Amino acid sequence: GFVAGLHSFMREARLQAQFSHPALLEVYRVWEQNGTAYMAMRYYRGVTLREMLRTNPQIATEQWLCETLDPILLALQELHNEKCYHRDIAPDNILVLPNGRSVLMDFGAARRIIGGMTRALTTVLKPGYAPIEQYSDDGSMQQGAWTDIYAVGGVLYHAMTGKVPVQAISRMMNDPLKPVAAAARGE
């Protein structure tokens, strides 16, 4: 209930506040007061990558994608160096600012790995962007940096083809995912 949600919010906010990278949301302060929790963060004006691709799909040139996603990959490197994994990367969690800078949002699924185990393992996934290990609800499949990199690959596929990738679970047998070149041509 509420208490579990409060603890989850505080865990997310504190984790996010530990990092300082231009492609990560900047958290100024996290605190509990009046029986609830607060997170003061920088205000960002922008549009999600999902919305940008929906309204202007031609924007997704190779150069634009490199300029947009390189900062995200560098931010992920910083997270991964600290054994922290975002686990929810998708076009709706990438904000593109008016100056073209991109920012990775929503640390709700992020977990820090301690001793090979994630704290409070939960099944969190975004169909099309989540690798197969995120479909395991018993924690039997290990997650790591590759989990986030798979999701970035899904974001690239979506940007280049205009289509959400086929879910990882559906790709296990007789993979129906079209190669990006064929899908981009509409084949």
Predicted regions and their residues:
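Activation segment signature within eukaryotic-like protein kinase domains
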Residues: 68-69
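Conserved short submotifs of the Hanks-type protein kinase catalytic core
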Residues: 34-48, 52
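Activation-loop N-terminal segment of eukaryotic-like protein kinases
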Residues: 96-100
